[in-house]
Each structure stands twice: as structure tokens, then as C-alpha cells.
Design a protein with these regions (language model features):
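Conserved ABC transporter NBD signature motif
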Residues: 68-78, 86
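ABC ATPase nucleotide-binding domain "signature" region
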Residues: 43, 156-161
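Helix-to-loop junction immediately C-terminal to a conserved catalytic motif
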Residues: 60
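Conserved ABC ATPase "signature" region
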Residues: 122-140
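The feature captures the beta-strand-to-loop junction immediately N-terminal to the Walker
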Residues: 45-47
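Short helical segment in ABC ATPase nucleotide-binding domains corresponding to the A-loop/adjacent helical element
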Residues: 98, 104-115, 125, 129
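Conserved ABC ATPase signature
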Residues: 144-148, 152
Length: 161
């Protein structure tokens, strides 16, 4: 079973023109299909505006497809009742991690997601320890995110998802 299956994905942004209040559609993704197995390393390359971030948002169920289908862990991203479970499975780290770091210290940032999912405090503590160890950031647990380098901030953002 694939971890991610994308079949004939289509996504159109709706834009509204100012004066005429006319709806204009812009196709960001047109007929993309791919499969990713657990453990695969995948890179998505393309020019600015080619749909890379839009695809990532689709995989994390932050946007609904205009057409086609996406399965993440066997769950359909278009089904409202499965979105929370998909978001527990797939996370997104933005290009500029400053936009998603909100805690006063690193461990608060790493704990933010699990706290919002209602995970018990003891489990959150274990997850923080494991996530920071896996990204090599254990020594920065009590540090202010503002004092970290850009690469360190990205590692903290990854630890948080």
C-alpha cells in the first residue's frame, strides 16, 4: 500500500476581479498523478508559481482538489470527516519557519501541535524529547526560537510536525 496516492489531480484558484466582481479561475495543478511509498524520499522541483506549494498543501489537506483524488494513508483528502486524521499523518513546514514558530522557547513550539490534538501531557513530553533528538536539536530545548539560525528554525518546525 502506498502512503500517498495522487490520481489526476486538478486544482484551480478562484480569483475575483475588482470592479466587475468577475470570478477568474487560474489552474495551478493540471492532471498530476504520483504514488509515494513509506520510506521514499521525494523531491518536487519547479519554477516559481509552478504549483509545488499548492501540491504540498493538497497533500496536507489544507486545500481541496478541484478534480482528481488524493489518498494519504488510505484517507481521501476531499472527505471532511477524514481531514483531522490526515493532518495527524501529514504535516507541512513552510519555506520561512518564522511564520510558524510561536512559542517563547523551542519545546513550546514542538508541543503546540500535539497539545491542540488533545494528546496527554506525558505523551507530549515523550514526543518532544524524541522529535528534538531526531533532528539533532535536543540542546536547544530551552532556547528562544528567535536566537536560532534559519536552518535550526527549520529543524524545530520539522520537530513540531
Amino acid at each position: 500500500m502506498n502512503l500517498i496516492d495522487v490520481k489526476n489531480l486538478l486544482f484551480k484558484y478562484k480569483m475575483y476581479s475588482g470592479e466587475k466582481e468577475e470570478v477568474i479561475e487560474h489552474t495551478a495543478i493540471d492532471n498530476i498523478s504520483l504514488s509515494i511509498k513509506k520510506g521514499d524520499f521525494v523531491g518536487i522541483l519547479g519554477h516559481n508559481g509552478s504549483g509545488k506549494s499548492t501540491l504540498a498543501k493538497q497533500l496536507a489537506a489544507l486545500l481541496k482538489p478541484s478534480g482528481g483524488i488524493i489518498y494519504v494513508g488510505g484517507m481521501d483528502t476531499a472527505k471532511e470527516e477524514q481531514i483531522l486524521d490526515i493532518r495527524k499523518t501529514a504535516g507541512l513546514v513552510f519555506q520561512n519557519p518564522d511564520n510558524q514558530l510561536i512559542g517563547n522557547i523551542v519545546e513550546e513550539d514542538v508541543a503546540f501541535g500535539p497539545e491542540n490534538m488533545g494528546i496527554p501531557a506525558e505523551e507530549i513530553e515523550m514526543r518532544i524529547t524524541k522529535a528534538l533528538a531526531s533532528t539533532g536539536m535536543t540542546a536547544y530545548r530551552e532556547a528562544s526560537p528567535g536566537a536560532l539560525s534559519g536552518g535550526q528554525k527549520q529543524k524545530i518546525a520539522i520537530s513540531g510536525v
